[in-house]
């Protein structure tokens, strides 16, 4: 996990080095990519390919979106691109690894807050080296947030069904 920590921190420095990155539309009116997204993703894929030469990649800024049973890295080089180029300081770098379509480990780094989240299957999760856990709060007392996958119409109904299932329980 130390290698993942170092890799994410280096990518975070790279992300912050772009002061006014060029912004490109990905086709949808609210779906963007910046030159920083492309550079950070390239850096991450290159570094991970050297360490794991047989690995596959499911990277946001490319069309490599096939999930197999092989070790696969799922990468969002700048999660929160719109916030990033609008300087809202609410973006992070996300890497997950799955094998046989099951999570193996993941890392999320927020370079603005210098917060590193690392998790490994069977070993738990940490934030800046401190163990974190889910609470034992019952669902009817919980606060729940969710994303809506706004760029993928095929996921709209799944989001709606999920929210419809949860709402009566909170």
Task: Give the location of each predicted region.
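Glycine/small-residue-rich loop that forms an oxyanion/phosphate-binding "nest" at active or ligand-binding sites
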Residues: 86, 95
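N-terminal subdomain of lithium-sensitive/metallo-dependent phosphomonoesterases centered on the IMPase/IPPase/PAP
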Residues: 1-78
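Short loop/turn microsegments at loop-to-beta-strand junctions
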Residues: 69-73, 93, 104
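Acidic beta-strand-loop-alpha-helix segment within the catalytic core
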Residues: 96-170
């Amino acid at each position: 996990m130390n290698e993942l920590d170092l890799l994410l921190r280096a990518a975070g420095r790279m992300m912050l080095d772009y002061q006014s990155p060029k912004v490109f539309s990905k086709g949808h009116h609210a779906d963007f990519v910046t030159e920083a997204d492309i550079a950070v993703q390239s850096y991450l894929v290159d570094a991970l390919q050297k360490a794991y030469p047989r690995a596959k990649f499911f990277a946001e800024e490319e069309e490599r979106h096939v999930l197999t049973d092989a070790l696969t890295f799922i990468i969002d080089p700048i999660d929160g691109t719109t916030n990033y180029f609008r300087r809202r300081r609410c973006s992070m770098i996300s890497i997950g690894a799955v094998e046989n379509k099951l999570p193996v480990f993941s890392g999320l780094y927020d370079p603005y807050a210098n917060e590193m989240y690392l998790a490994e299957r069977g070993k738990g999760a940490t934030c800046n080296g401190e163990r974190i856990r889910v609470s034992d709060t019952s669902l009817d007392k919980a606060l729940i947030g969710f994303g809506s996958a706004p760029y993928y119409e095929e996921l709209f109904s799944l989001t709606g069904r999920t929210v419809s299932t949860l709402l009566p329980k909170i």
